[in-house]
Curated annotation (Swiss-Prot):
The entry's keywords: Aminoacyl-tRNA synthetase, ATP-binding, Cytoplasm, Ligase, Magnesium, Metal-binding, Nucleotide-binding, Protein biosynthesis
Binding site for Mg(2+): 255
Keyword Secreted: no
Species lineage: Bacteria, Bacillati, Bacillota, Clostridia, Eubacteriales
EC number: 6.1.1.20
UniProt catalytic activity: tRNA(Phe) + L-phenylalanine + ATP = L-phenylalanyl-tRNA(Phe) + AMP + diphosphate + H(+)
Family statement drawn from the similarity comment of this UniProt entry: Belongs to the class-II aminoacyl-tRNA synthetase family. Phe-tRNA synthetase alpha subunit type 1 subfamily.
Stored Gene3D superfamilies: Bira Bifunctional Protein, Domain 2 (3.30.930.10)
The protein, known as: Phenylalanine--tRNA ligase alpha subunit
Classification via Pfam families: Phe_tRNA-synt_N, tRNA-synt_2d
GO CC annotation: cytoplasm
Length: 340
């Protein structure tokens, strides 16, 4: 029996030395120390030996079992250490490698031009006002001198939510809302940046776009004040070299009304494809506040006057940055946005 135990010991040690993975080690453990393993069967067979031989063989067999268990633990620890070293080696960081620069965020060009416009008018004493994008028909049309049967309603295709609610087609409703809150106090000097909605969608129109509305109410306000304000605005946005002109126009909420043009920023007024070879670019509409609108707002047109203007922010941005397709603003193309 002692010789058999020695043979099993030598054989197990030889096989264990050849084990090269955790899978092989687990297989070795089952074959030697498992329920039907060699050492387990050896220990079970001791019961058939005589007393003295059983004691000697039992001591040697138990030593073999303990030695094998110790060798298994050491082997397991060695494999775990090797596995850890391999993992650390794979995750090794070369601190001498150059760092990857972080990409910095940028303001959208429409955000940039909106803030620039706001800063210009705030510098002239204006404050920023806001209003709802889902607007009452009353404020969007009627209070701006556009009654239900007025032909000017045909000029704008609107997104109606119900008979009395729609997505505002311009930021002008905030004019009346502000006058209602302020009346009869004067002066009022506000600009209203915001989103507006119309049923247009092509290279120069979008169903959602941005406007900046302006309103000034006070005593003895004249068209000269309007011209001076907007000329200063044009020079600050497009440069002191641009020339400004006004053309008669029509808006229900202003009287008289005008369109303001600037000399073409692409050809400096010489005539090109952008300005249709006229040398001029339309940038906004303006006029003196219609007396009926003043009355809707709670003011006496015999006591106060005012002017208003409105411009498309996309239009200003396209002219300033030389962009020929409005849709580029809404496509979120990083190649386009990274230029600003």
């Amino acid at each position: 029996m002692l010789r058999k135990i020695e043979e099993i010991k030598n054989e197990c040690q030889a096989r264990l030395s050849q084990v090269s993975s955790m899978e092989e080690l687990n297989e070795f453990r089952i074959k030697t120390l498992g329920r039907k393993g060699e050492v387990t069967l050896l220990l079970r067979g001791l019961k058939d030996l005589s007393g003295e031989e059983k004691a000697r063989a039992g001591r040697v067999a138990n030593e073999l079992k303990q030695n094998l268990e110790q060798m298994l633990r050491e082997k397991i620890d060695a494999f775990k250490l090797d596995e850890l070293e391999q993992k650390l080696l794979q995750e090794k960081i070369d601190v001498t490698l150059p760092g990857l620069p972080r990409q910095r965020g940028r303001q959208h060009p429409l955000t940039q031009i909106t803030r620039e416009i706001q800063d210009i008018f705030i510098g002239m004493g204006f404050t920023v006002a806001e209003g709802p994008e889902i607007e009452l028909d009353y404020y969007n049309f009627e209070a701006l001198n556009v009654p239900r049967d007025h032909p000017a309603r045909d000029m704008q295709d609107s997104f109606y939510i119900s008979e009395e609610l729609l997505l505002r087609t311009h930021t002008s409703p905030v004019q009346v809302r502000t006058m209602e809150k302020m009346a009869p106090q004067i002066p009022i000097k506000i600009i209203v940046p915001g989103k507006v909605y119309r049923k247009d969608d092509d290279a120069t129109h979008s169903p959602m776009f941005h406007q900046v509305e302006g309103l000034v109410i006070g005593q003895r306000i004249t068209f000269a004040h309007l011209k001076g304000t907007l000329v200063r605005f044009a020079h600050q946005v497009f440069g002191e070299d641009v020339t400004v002109r006004y053309r008669p126009s029509f808006f229900p909420f202003t009287e008289p009304s005008a369109e303001m043009d600037i000399s073409c920023v692409m050809c400096q007024g010489e005539g090109c494809r952008v300005c249709s070879h006229t040398g001029w670019l339309e940038i906004l509409g303006a006029g003196m506040v219609n007396p009926r609108v003043l009355q809707y707002g709670g003011y006496d047109p015999e006591e106060v006057t005012g002017f208003a203007f409105g411009m498309g922010i996309e239009r200003i941005a396209m002219l300033k940055y030389g962009i020929n397709d409005l849709r580029l603003f809404f496509e979120n193309d990083k190649r386009f946005l990274a230029q600003f």
